[in-house]
Regions:
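Non-catalytic terminal extensions that flank enzyme cores
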Residues: 1-53, 67, 71-81, 97-103, ...
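Short catalytic/ligand-binding loop motif for oxyanion handling, primarily in non-cytosolic enzymes
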Residues: 49-51, 86-90, 152-155
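Di-metal (Zn2+ and/or Mg2+/Mn2+) metal-binding site signature of metallo-dependent hydrolases
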Residues: 53-60
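Short, solvent-exposed turn/loop segments enriched in Gly/Ser/Thr/Pro and often Arg
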Residues: 80-87, 147-148
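Charged, often glycine-rich, active-site loop that binds/positions anionic groups
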Residues: 86-103, 159-161
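A glycine-rich helix N-cap at a beta->alpha junction
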Residues: 101-120, 134, 138
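Two-metal-ion acidic nuclease core segments, chiefly of the RNase H-like superfamily
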Residues: 122-134
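Active-site cores that bind ATP or allylic diphosphates and position pyrophosphate for catalysis
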Residues: 136, 140-183
């Protein structure tokens, strides 16, 4: 661990990003630890294919910011690696067996598709396990979260209902930010 005063003066991008988080939460002098007791950082993973260098890079970069943050200010942090495993399969990856079988599941949630490798409950579960194994080999400090589990547990229900109830207000905010070519409502 480096000295806090030194960490606050470093110009490397992870430290600049960490300082932005601190600034948005009261600054160095008035920083308040969030009510949950930690600052949360998150990475996302779309398990429609096997983990790759881009997946690794996202976790590395976020971990660098997390470590810089912890060097600058005394506040617990948590890194969540969130798997969007309810996403639909858009195309069959080139580097998997049983491609013909997977073709039948285009558009289906990744955790509802049989594992073409025949090792896990689903293709999504297989790729999630690969990611966790990959991250564990490099000793990343993270918590893995599956969107399938979150949906099945009802963890998103309140937010989804809130979105439905405020749909028009949300559109009023979002639509002006979209290019006209993207609007198909």
């Amino acid at each position: 661990m480096i000295d806090q005063e030194l960490a606050q003066s470093l110009k490397a991008w992870p430290f600049k990003e960490a300082l932005q988080i601190i600034k948005k939460n009261g600054g160095l002098q008035n920083f308040k630890i969030p009510s949950k007791g930690y600052v949360l950082l998150e990475t996302g993973y779309g398990p429609s294919g096997l983990p790759h260098i881009g997946t690794f890079g996202e976790v590395v970069r976020t971990s660098m910011v997390k470590n810089a943050f912890s060097s600058i200010i005394d506040c617990p942090t948590k890194l969540i690696t969130f798997s969007d495993d309810m996403d639909g399969l858009r195309k069959v990856p080139e580097n998997v067996p049983n491609k013909e079988m997977l073709e039948k599941f285009i558009g289906k949630p990744l955790t509802s598709i049989p594992d073409p490798f025949g090792k896990f409950e689903s293709f999504g579960h297989h790729n999630n396990a690969k990611l966790r194994s990959f991250l564990d080999k490099f000793n990343f400090d993270y918590e893995f979260v599956s969107s399938t589990e979150k949906y099945q547990n009802g963890d998103f229900n309140e937010t989804i209902l809130n979105i439905f109830e405020n749909y028009s207000k949300i559109l009023d905010i979002i639509l002006p930010t979209l290019r006209l070519s993207l609007i198909h409502i």
